[in-house]
Amino acid sequence: MFSHTKKVGPTGRFGPRYGLKIRVRVRDVEIKAKKKYKCPVCGFPKLKRASTSIWVCGKCGAKIAGGAYTPETGAGKAVMKAIRRIVERKEE
């Protein structure tokens, strides 16, 4: 049985239950979690979610702790940006 369509994606399994807003949020989160990301160690797009906040590269085998549904959180990006600025200022 085919459980989803182009519009609703993986949340097609819920049918008309739970309301549209909740299903849209769940769809976005599930798509982000299932997506393959670029590995920060080897650079290949093989980083896959193993469990909550644990990401494993299929090529080099690196295990990385990240966000629950994406390998990099918004707060983590902001911190890395601030660190880069500090390093650049010290180099000048």
UniProtKB/Swiss-Prot annotation:
GO terms for biological process: translation. Disulfide bonds: none annotated. Gene3D superfamilies: 2.20.25.30. A zinc finger (C4-type) spans 39-60. Zn(2+) binds at residues 39, 42, 57, 60. The keyword Amino-acid biosynthesis does not apply. Pfam families: Ribosomal_L37ae (PF01780). One of its GO terms (molecular function) is zinc ion binding. One of its GO terms (cellular component) is cytosolic ribosome. The keyword Cell division does not apply. Its cofactor is Zn(2+). Keywords: Metal-binding, Ribonucleoprotein, Ribosomal protein, RNA-binding, rRNA-binding, Zinc, Zinc-finger. Binds 1 zinc ion per subunit. Part of the 50S ribosomal subunit. Belongs to the eukaryotic ribosomal protein eL43 family. Putative zinc-binding subfamily. Binds to the 23S rRNA. This is Large ribosomal subunit protein eL43. It comes from Methanocaldococcus jannaschii (strain ATCC 43067 / DSM 2661 / JAL-1 / JCM 10045 / NBRC 100440). The lineage of its organism: Archaea, Methanobacteriati, Methanobacteriota, Methanomada group, Methanococci.
